[in-house]
Amino acid sequence: MKFPIGIQNFPKVRQDGYVYVDKTAFIYKLASEGSYYFLSRPRRFGKSLLISTMDAYFRGRKELFHGLALETLEKDWTVYPVVHIDLNTGKYDSEDALFHVLNDYLCKLEDIYGKYPSEVTPELRFKGIIERIAKKHNQRVVILVDEYDKPMLQAIDNPELQEHFRNTLKAFYSVLKTQDQYIKFAFLTGVTKFGKVSVFSDLNNLVDISMDARYQGICGITQDELMTYFKSSVQDFADAYGINLDEAAAKLKKRYDGYHFRQRGVDIYNPFSLLNTFATGELGSYWFETSTPSFLVQLLKRDNYYLPNLTEEEVSGDFLNSVDSVDVSPVPILYQSGYLTIKDYDQRFQTYALGFPNEEVSEGFTEYLLPYYTNMEKNASPMFVGQFVHDMEKGKPEAFMKRMAVLFADTDYKIVGDAELYFQNAFYLITKLLGFYTEVEHTISDGRIDMIAKTKDYIYIFEFKYDRSADTALRQIDEKGYAAPFAADPRKLYKVGVNFNREKRCIDEWKVIS
């Protein structure tokens, strides 16, 4: 089986014999029921391949759809002229950058369809091109725009530049409304949906299908599609790991599944990571490693964001679908970028509970964050976590605490602001990472942090205090009876009292009692 990893061209997928998960019924439904659509999905989720498939369909390339749903659904196969714009290729670091990309597309079209001297701005040129294309072919035009938001995403930390891009694109995309009589179909994709003064504010005819129940499976791979198209690949994976088919499916689900694009939505697998796993035979962090969320980390640090809230707060749909660079909250960007997903929905209050979609994202994001909050070199998280886990598994709480103290040494330059919040965030990341390898429960609340960790042979009860003493922490373990539930447990139990010094921003004392 040939896996189309990184291949976004539908004709190439079909002609070269790559496996294709049939999404063409969605395309037929869109084309037959409406005209103007917008879809947001995380990067590497199949948006570009979807756009390419639409391109082939509207050009009437029936031969490419043999055996697919569209072959029988479509009766006429009318050929339409298609304008396909992809903004993913540019580097948008100056005001001229967007103009150069748009100008390249417009010049190529004007070489074919001409230009009037009065058409001096991108939007006027685009307007004239659409009209001339429609008149020349005596057929309305199909407009496909891939990664509409790439310029604004690249400028999200530069409000002035982003505003320039927004104004340019708002005028450019407004042509889709003014030239409605010449347009058959328009489809725009991107990662985000920008709020406030949106580039789409003039397009009241644009239907956002990003959270539409009918189209939640339009990108990505569902469980049914996994077992329909890739059952033999799942079996190959199972054979390589020496497990059965169900166990292999469970491993893949835990690692790559879990995306939800609406309340009570179906589970969607990350297609990029899944295909890479089938190709290599190895579980990995394929999606996460293709792009680092460095700007998102800067947002979290800038706002002194309380990290547990990433997976504990409930938010509204309007909040989720609004991204703006001014006083921006990191949560909508994390959601729309694929680092968070919908976990639950409260119908009474119409709010969403968010969480990491799967193990790949949760582990990758946590490992990536930890060096920004502790005294750790970048890319060293897996090594440190391994050492922590080995200390726990071997019954070495003193060694564990020495490593913990090192992580909090000399970190004042990394995080400014509230020292207690800094410690809570770092502690959250450490326990989150430990939880991938050991059984960990933790509580982080006002004035209190504790952790219970369990391995095959040991149980550890940690109590952390601020500007107190290790003895005070140990007394609380006894007075609150934290060890009582484990009285009959044969595993050896350690009580660990820890004090965090706010002024020095470090762990300055700990004691261990067994």
Model-derived features: positions:
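Metal-dependent nuclease catalytic cores in nucleic-acid-processing enzymes
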Residues: 172-179, 332-340, 428-432, 476-496
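Conserved catalytic cores of phosphodiester-cleaving nucleases, focusing on short active-site segments
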Residues: 427, 451-466, 480
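Domain-level recognition of nuclease-like catalytic cores that cleave nucleotide substrates
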Residues: 485, 489-514
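Active-site metal-binding core of divalent-cation-utilizing nuclease and nuclease-like domains
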Residues: 133-137, 430-456
